[in-house]
């Protein structure tokens, strides 16, 4: 029924779902509809999580493609440039940037990433590539990406915990 989603939230909880139509795997992106079939948004599903669906867009025409993800990354970066010192900043702030479950902090030319949801974890390599591309357009070359995805919630999402460099051009 999507009460939370209808009232402006970006999540659908397990007790708000009547049925899921068609085949899917946890982490897949699905069209979310109310009980009358009215489109509510695109979101990724994970039946292992109490937050069963995390919505990435409320617009039917926004299929989740690489182009869509680039727009999300670009919008987040443009917003940060207009509002904060971007030398060190939270570049992507999960649901606030419509990339639920993903946090990307920028410290000069190093990124620190946290992924808290299975669906966004699948998209993480593409999103990080797009972050590097968008920043490079402003002359910022990323020399390292450190992942700090060690929160316990990852286990509930069906993912392993991880902490370490996933890209390192820095000699330590």
Model-derived regions: residue spans:
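Non-catalytic accessory regions of SAM-dependent methyltransferases
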Residues: 1-108, 137, 163-166
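N-terminal auxiliary segments of SAM/dcSAM-dependent transferases
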Residues: 85-97, 105-168
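Conserved small/polar residues in nucleotide/adenosyl-binding loops
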Residues: 170-172
